[in-house]
């Protein structure tokens, strides 16, 4: 989203009614599928995300389904700044291939060397269901699922296996009201659940 010069005249730059379905992405660099950054990101710097914020600046009617991402350099699938996004029936295999010191050669520059499988960022009431993620490569996250800095994320009926960072992370203080139920984890490494500074 580009920042509008005259927001009152042109309206807010945001995504509505986006559907990504039936795609096969292979050997991309930083992301497999990502929707959609916001030029108003500073407005979302809080734990409890009010509906009014999404009414004004959030993305609406985001649907990501039946996609397959493999051999991705970073994250598999991420939805950002969205109200009630639905992410279902997606599969990922061998993601985070570039999250290592060959690509991030400065040890003190930790910022970009993180990736997870299928996850929302700064979204509200995100539903992620019937997804599968396998073989997330080791990095500073590397979990299949990541309830990251959002309000009301629900993971249910997902299947993860052989992910080097584990099954799920509840990431940082601004990830609240999350639920993780009826999911199956098989041979995920590095621990099943990572609270990572989460208050819940």
Question: What is the role of each PLM region?
Answer:
Residues 2, 35, 79, 120, ...:
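Extracellular beta-strand solenoids
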Residues 14-30, 43-75, 83-107, 114-117, ...:
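Right-handed parallel beta-helix
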Residues 4, 37-39, 83:
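Active-site-proximal loop/turn and secondary-structure-junction residues that shape catalytic pockets
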Residues 1-13:
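Extracellular beta-strand-rich solenoid/capping regions of secreted or surface-exposed proteins
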Residues 9, 76-77, 169:
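A generic structural signal for short coil/turn motifs at secondary-structure boundaries
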Residues 6-8, 115, 142:
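Extracellular loop and loop/strand-boundary signature of outer-membrane beta-barrel proteins
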